[in-house]
Amino acid sequence: MASLAGDRWREALKNHDIFNNLQERLHLEPQGTSKRIAKNLTFCLNGDLFIWDSVESVFYTTNLRQLNSDGEPDTSRYQTLLCINPPLFEVCQVLVSPSQYHVALIGQRGATVLELPQRWGKKSEFEGGRIQINCKTIPVAERFFTSSASVTLRQAVWYPSETEEPHLVLLTSDNTIRFYNLKEPQSPARVLSVSQMDDDSSVHTRSRSYAASLGETAVAFDFGPLADSPHLSSLRMKAELVVYPLYILYGNGETFLNYISLSHSVGSLGKPMGPLPMYPAAEDNYGYDACAVLCLPCVPNILVIATESGMLYHCVVLEAEEEEDGGAVERWSRGSETAPSLYVFECVELELTLKLPAGEEEEITESDFTCPIRLHRDPLCQHRYHCTHEAGVHSVGLTWFKKLHKFLESDEEDKDSLQELAAEQRCIVEHILCTRPLANSLPAPVRGFWIVSDLSLGATMICITSTYECLLLPLLSSIRPASPPLLCSHPGAGSDSSPLRGLAEDSFEQHIRNILARSSTNPLMLRSGDKDSSPPPSECLQLLSRATQVFREEYILKLGLAHEEMQRRVKLLSGQKNKQLEDLALCREDRKSLTEAAERLADKYEDAKYRQEAIMNRVKRVLGSLRSQLPVLSDSEKDMRKELQTINDQLRHLDNGIKQVNMKKDYQKKQMNAGASPAHSSLTLNAHQRKCLQGVLKEQGEHIAGMMKQIKDIKNHFSF
């Protein structure tokens, strides 16, 4: 029941009125080349799903947590965010700022920033739950795009700092990256020229077209994680400044690097460093149709370079050594700066259109279909990212990153072992959605893509199709890192788990997973056009043949291999079990014999101990007799004699004291007897005097008794 309650919002979102309204106005959208481009018009923020309506130029938003609440979900309730100054261009992408207060509306002919309204009320809705809300919009570089008709916007991202003022970074077709502050959206706060020409002041449209044909124009860029400014000594920056590395990708596959700090009070930035050397070297420089770059925020940084032909290059960013900072970066070096190098750890080819099986007499022909690819980070896993393009959606998981991290920490310098590591474990590529199964199929690119990172809703991929159909797909759980175990679940010394499991680097389960890993899958296929019309029989036959081949090669055959491996494992474990049972029987016999031997040894030990004590007593007596016959006193005997002399002196002194006491006693007795008779008649004592005299006599008697007792004890102690 808990799983059904967690899936309630998924069923409600598919049938939401937002998508019904968008599907009804689908025919009103402009028809043109933009329909062939994969867009991203949706995002999630604090459990709210936002979808951009290109016809009305508004945002529709609904709360996913409320759809997941108990009771019947209200699929007709949503809020509409109106733009006070709607964009005049067609929006292809929406980007939420790092501070989550602004949303950038990106198109090929401009950019506009929408400021999100405030939240209040019981359900924390925008402006207390109003149905329609006017939102402030800020056009960015509007005058620049209006005056420059031939310049198009290639890419736009937010500056990644959350503590500084929000800045929107734009890459335009004139090989320039501009940083715009929202307080002054018409004039750039920073300008970075990324042209490979020495003098860019006289560049015209024809020159830019020549540079584009040669692949010398910047096509994409991405910010890396926060850099440590003290290591950038050549930049002459203060240690407290926030510095981000900026990776710039050109169409010919070259990558350049620049360090950006908006706290630096310089209006224009210097030339980027590059091209960054790539190892191992390739004749085609790893592609000539690069289109996207993504820096994964892990250590070491992984740079993903995508080409329009569907190739993905996973490059490890390695710090440069002193002998490597010449040659390749000589033209672009600035002072004593050193540029890092890119080690191409892995090359992956995406299956853009489905590869159809060839007949017996047919030759396998390579598909020449190409399209731009857009890369998306995964908020739940740093080692995973996603690709959206005209032909569908792919997910890529870097399962080898942990082994690479261990290899880099081991300080090994053997490049062959690094290549063996790359060939040992490949990344996992999952074909999630196919919107163009064949190269001659009509385009149907996705209109929205997002990963729900709210764990209360569950890790889910949201895909909005070209017909505004909401697809909710599960993520590949084998890539996402497992949650840490509870403290109470840690196995102790008495755990039933085998100690041999810790000796193996990879478990048998991981071995089976590697066998079952699929190089190609049967994705969820969507086709454009009328849903009621059936595809041609030839296309159906090709797709059926392809699905059959994938099921045969990637499922049935690999399941057979896994079955054989498991049978081999069972046979091996059965043999080990029989051998261990035999060893256990031998151990029981050995334990029984050892117990009997221990009992015999215990008896012998007791006998030997008794004999040893008897011998020790005899030795003591013999030594005592020998010591007594020696003419010279030992040290202990001398001490004993001295102690006896001291005791004798003390006894003599006490004897004298006793004699004196006795003499005093006799004298006092005589005195009492002599004066008792004459004084009896004449001397009379009163009661008080009699009492005092009795007390004195009693004290003297007690004193004498104590002395007598002390003398008696001394005599008893020394046996006198």
UniProtKB/Swiss-Prot annotation:
It holds the Pfam family Nup88. GO terms for cellular component: nuclear pore. One of its GO terms (biological process) is mRNA export from nucleus. Residues 584-611 form a coiled coil. It is found in: Nucleus, Nuclear pore complex. GO terms for molecular function: structural constituent of nuclear pore. The keyword Protein transport applies. InterPro entries: Nucleoporin_Nup88 (IPR019321), NUP88/NUP82 (IPR037700). It comes from the Eukaryota. Widely expressed. Higher levels of expression are detected in highly proliferative frontal regions of the embryo, e.g. brain, eye and anterior trunk. Changing residue 414 to Y: Does not rescue developmental defects in sa2206 mutants. Keywords: Coiled coil, mRNA transport, Nuclear pore complex, Nucleus, Protein transport, Translocation, Transport. PANTHER family: NUCLEAR PORE COMPLEX PROTEIN NUP88, NUCLEOPORIN NUP84-RELATED. Component of the nuclear pore complex. This is Nucleoporin 88. It comes from Danio rerio. The lineage of its organism: Eukaryota, Metazoa, Chordata, Craniata, Vertebrata.
